[in-house]
Amino acid sequence: MATKTDDFAPFPVKDQLPGVEFCVSSSPNWPEGIVLGFQHYIVMLGTTVIIPSILVPLMGGGDVEKAEVINTVLFVSGINTLLQSLFGSRLPVVMGASYAYLIPALYITFSYRFTYYLHPHLRFEETMRAIQGALIIASISHMIMGFFGLWRILVRFLSPLSAAPLVILTGVGLLAFAFPQLARCIEIGLPALIILIILSQYLPHLFKCKRSICEQFAVLFTIAIVWAYAEILTAAGAYDKRPDNTQLSCRTDRSGLISASPWVRIPYPLQWGRPSFHGSDAFAMMAATYVAIVETTGSFIAASRFGSATHIPPSVLSRGIGWQGIGVLLNGLFGTATGSTALVENTGLLGLTKVGSRRVVQISAGFMIFFSIFGKFGAVLASIPLPIFAALYCVLFAYVASAGLGLLQFCNLNSFRNKFILGFSIFIGLSVAQYFTEYLFISGRGPVHTRTSAFNVIMQVIFSSAATVGIMAAFLLDCTHSYGHASVRRDSGRHWWEKFRVYHTDTRTEEFYALPYNLNRFFPSF
């Protein structure tokens, strides 16, 4: 039989990702949307619990303080998610706690001035106030970058070639929170990973699940099955004589968090007292905000793909960064001990479920606010073993990385210039970040150790982020390497994104990114 010519035709380039069930501006029915929103809430719980669990004990807090901080993070995350989806980027992203702020928060926590406080609760409050003050000051620079259009100017020079490493490393850069955390309780984490892959990838093709139920709710089914399995192991005494670290990772009866959580409590601004302000703390926290801006940009680009929207215009992206800065301000006012970012795991969930609806994410924000107020119910869900979340991350982070790989369809991969920029930026991003992170864990300080401790922390924060290092390398090389050659513009894919550089150039932009209530008249995008 003769070979068809179509078999050798290249796959067409798509401005919008096909195969998505619900795009940014469309919505599922309410029952389905509520379940999908609850699923987003469950997925973001892992990061919400991990960061306070690291910081609060070091700050001097106990189970009560940890429960209060977790509920505060949930409450502020719900508000930030609503603000971002309504007035910011308008993309279906969940705004939550960011790992980028861990290093400056630890720098403040271990500051010598807090050693004078002997009472743990008093030391916790004083440390929290210092972190709050640093977040408030850092949020100002964050908002300036967004609302004054400084970030818009920079991202206009992004091409698909330089954006690909950014999005790839936004997903891959968090690999330390995936399988290494799964392996802490392999008998729970590995079954969760296998079940999730079977439910989401194989079962839909074997049984032809109606309306992609297997794909859309695979995360909820996986958590329910493996959590019940973990409950059985815990009740059977499988971990009674195991080391404390194993029990912490595997057991489901972490009663300290549940008993410490109040039935009803509404977080409020300045609940820990008046923030304190120190210049070195603020500069260290500013570095974290810039890293969060970079990583959020990667999540925004991935979310626009998974939501079947057109490429996000620089002005809209900058607007979203500005509202993220307002979110960091709220983090500082309420006292969450960390800033906000677009959560990578929830962005990956858009790809897994093929549901990029804005309404679903807004519903998830409602769950965040509800469970933050009624703390006992939220604490029960927060007791899900962390290796189960790590199993989810193995798939969800990979989806975000795949969104970055998808941008390469706009580029000429036969160009040796492109091969070098792509390969080098990904490699150097992972390599430098791993070096800085390992150096910190082995020696207790970063490789940069000058007399100015704040500068050392700034360098550690920036170069511990694979996405930040990768985009710096890719952006610099793409804008300087053979830039004057006639073929470079097409090879890097700039001509594909040219029509999205200005807001009104493409008619589809208004459908996905226009502000509600006709607010574009008063706050125009350019």
From Swiss-Prot:
Residues spanning the signal sequence: none
UniProt keyword annotation of Transport present: yes
Membrane-spanning ranges: 42-62, 69-89, 91-111, 131-151, 157-177, 186-206, 217-237, 282-302, 359-381, 388-410, 420-440, 457-477
Coiled-coil intervals: none
Tissue note: Highly expressed in the root central cylinder. Expressed in the filaments and stigmatic papillae of pollinated flowers and developing siliques.
Keyword Transport belongs to the record: yes
Membrane topology: Multi-pass membrane protein
One Gene Ontology cellular component annotation held by this UniProt entry: membrane
Keywords: Membrane, Transmembrane, Transmembrane helix, Transport
GO molecular function list: transmembrane transporter activity
Compartments in which it is found: Membrane
Protein family: Belongs to the nucleobase:cation symporter-2 (NCS2) (TC 2.A.40) family.
Official protein name in the record: Nucleobase-ascorbate transporter 4
Annotated source species: Arabidopsis thaliana (Mouse-ear cress)
Primary gene name: NAT4
